[in-house]
Design a protein with these regions (language model features):
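Flexible, glycine/small-residue-enriched loop-and-beta-strand segment within the central core
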Residues: 44-51, 56-166, 205-206, 210
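Conserved catalytic Walker-motif region of ABC-type ATPase nucleotide-binding domains
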Residues: 37
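Terminal amphipathic alpha-helical/low-complexity segments used for targeting or macromolecular assembly
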Residues: 1-34, 119, 125-126, 131-145, ...
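Short hydrophobic beta-strand element within catalytic cores of glycosyltransferases
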Residues: 184-185
């Protein structure tokens, strides 16, 4: 009897999941095959959101596709986004390339544009914000002076630790590692380990040395 009820419960779950995904497809620009989208997720302007195949979007995630472009948020193949992260194109765009992973409670603001490369890991509670408030005139409150925007580019195979902040205009090269808690205020080329507030280069990642050492 217990196994019978388990089968019924599993069947209902499969049917509900299928119907939920079909319902979402009515509104989204595109949702790829084999993508898992958990319930209790908030979407805004879903007709400007693309989710490719084999993605996992966990509960509590907020994705806002509002943009002046046709696509505000592009999520590549095999991307995972952990619980309670907030991704907002904010009239710009957020592009997350294939097989990258966004940790829990991250905030990505795409007002000035955010590009994240392939196989990149972003630790929990990281802020990636491509805009900032102006502060040119002391006679006008900062909140009324508008914003300035600069694109953020994060390369392929980058590992960003938890609790980092990436500021507008920053480019992080391929294969970089950003230590937890770092505040990245300027750009860095490929193959560096970076840490601190403000973040500075700590060492070069020498892949030829690593491979030769492992071979021995």
């Amino acid at each position: 009897m217990k196994s019978f009820f388990n089968i019924i419960r599993l069947t209902i779950k499969i049917i509900c999941t299928f119907l939920y995904k079909q319902y979402l497809r009515l509104f989204f620009k595109r949702i790829g095959k084999n993508s898992t989208i958990y319930p209790f997720i908030d979407f805004y302007q879903p007709d400007q959101i693309v989710i490719n195949t084999d993605c996992i979007i966990r509960k509590g995630v907020i994705i806002k596709g509002r943009s002046l472009n046709k696509i505000g948020v592009f999520i590549g193949k095999g991307v995972s986004i952990r619980e309670f992260s907030n991704i907002d194109s904010y009239m710009g765009y957020v592009h997350i390339d294939d097989y990258s992973a966004i940790g829990h409670n991250c905030i990505i603001g795409g007002h000035g544009g955010v590009k994240i490369g392939k196989y990149t890991m972003i630790g929990g509670q990281t802020y990636i914000i491509s805009s900032n408030h102006k502060f040119d005139d002391l006679d006008i409150p900062y909140m009324l002076q508008g914003e300035c925007t600069k694109e953020i580019i994060i390369g392929n195979n980058v590992w960003i630790g938890a609790n980092c902040t990436i500021l507008p205009g920053v480019t992080i090269g391929d294969n970089c590692i950003i230590a937890a808690g770092s505040v990245v205020t300027k750009s860095f080329p490929n193959n560096f380990m970076i840490a601190g507030n403000p973040a500075k280069i700590k060492k070069t990642i020498n892949f030829s040395y690593i491979w030769s050492k492992e071979t021995v």
